[in-house]
């Protein structure tokens, strides 16, 4: 992702 935490990265 960009800043926030994403399930992928």
Swiss-Prot record:
The UniProt keywords, alphabetically, are: Amidation, Calcium, Disulfide bond, G-protein coupled receptor impairing toxin, Gamma-carboxyglutamic acid, Metal-binding, Secreted, Toxin
What does the entry state regarding organ or tissue expression?
A: Expressed by the venom duct.
Q: Which domain of life is it from?
A: Eukaryota
Listed GO molecular functions? metal ion binding; toxin activity
Residues bearing Glycine amide are: 9
4-carboxyglutamate sites (modified residues): 8
Q: Name one GO cellular component term.
A: extracellular region
Which cellular compartments is it found in? Answer: Secreted
Record flagged with keyword Transferase: no
Describe the function of this protein: Targets vasopressin-oxytocin related receptors. Binds calcium.
Q: What is this protein called?
A: Gamma-conopressin vil
Organism whose genome encodes this protein: Conus villepinii
